[in-house]
Amino acid sequence: MSKGKRVRITNDSLNSYGTRVLTAGMNVEQYQRNPVLLYMHERGNVIGYVKDLKVENGEVTGELMFDEASELSIRCKKQYEFGSLKMVSAGLDILETSEDPELLVQGQTSPTVTKSKLFEVSLVDIGANDDAIVLQKDGKKITLGKDSECP
């Protein structure tokens, strides 16, 4: 098993579904007990786990650890290291939403998710949150979000 790269799993930014998921309202306790890493949100396609999950500064981050126990996991690890797969997506149970105008941002077309529960994280080809992408490699910060520059 190789050392993972820290990734942003989610933050408060607007996603492709026209909504936002507030990190402050996200419960990660159960997920921390079973930090499963899936491929494309498919149960049964476990490819590893998420190590060192952190909730701070309005975002959830962690390190992806590939178990290399299946051909799929080996392939995903290689593609992740190469950079052809670099996005993750949070599997969430939505517990509460709000249409409060103070919680809406420009371009938002759906209510804000104010309470949720993280139950899985997936390596995906195209994620809903443009900011859910690799944050650092070899100790150097990499910013590839929609409004950021790539060093």
Can you describe what each PLM-predicted range is?
Residues 1-147:
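Signature of dsDNA virion morphogenesis modules
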